[in-house]
Amino acid sequence: KSFHAQGAPLSIKTKVAVLHSWGKLRSWTLSGHFHETYMNDLIHINESLSGLPVDVSFISFEDVKAGALKDVDVVINAGYAGSAWSGGDNWKDEEVVSKLTEWVYNGGTFIGVDEPSAVAGYDTYFRMAHVLGIDEDTGARICHGKWQYDVSPVDGLMPEGSSIRGRSGLYLTDGNAR
């Protein structure tokens, strides 16, 4: 009890928002029964965020349209296509894409995990592909002229001995992505 009387825990100024369909309604959870389920990236992101010295909020797509981005530095969108975690049909709203794009242009950081901003029916599968620098070819079109790139290791980017599972069908959207 006296531990908490000493004040708030150390926190840096970075404010992170997790963007999904429910916003605050599903803060820090994935419906309760997905604990330690490897298929849901967001549970691992929540676990990581809970140990970082950052302020974390959970916002919905309606919150984005209402101006919630002015209060955050980083937005994380994670989940598989069509899910409420990734956003599903919320990505069909041009206002959401426009506000996030403008926010990134003005210095915000958008982080996508798994199939962020994914929705079919547009020129890109990831609606934020122009920000992410990557998109997914779902087989609905043929990707001719893919950007060629060399893989260059970046010291300190990943912890020693760790790895990231590859995913087929992804391609760079321009020659500037790193």
What are the functions of these language-model segments?
Residues 82, 87-174:
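A glycine-rich, often tryptophan-bearing local segment used as a flexible ligand/cofactor-contacting loop or short
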Residues 22-24, 62, 80-81, 116:
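Residue-level signal for short, function-critical loop segments
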Residues 48-68:
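A short, well-structured beta->alpha microelement
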Residues 68-75:
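Short acidic/histidine-rich motifs immediately flanking catalytic phosphotransfer sites
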Residues 29-38, 76-92:
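The substrate-binding groove and active-site-proximal loops of carbohydrate-active enzymes
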Residues 2-4, 61-64, 95-98:
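Alpha-helical scaffolding within the catalytic cores
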Residues 17-20, 58, 75-77, 110-112:
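Structural recognition of the beta-strand scaffold that forms the well-ordered cores
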Residues 1-44, 138-167, 172-174:
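Hydrophobic targeting/anchoring helices
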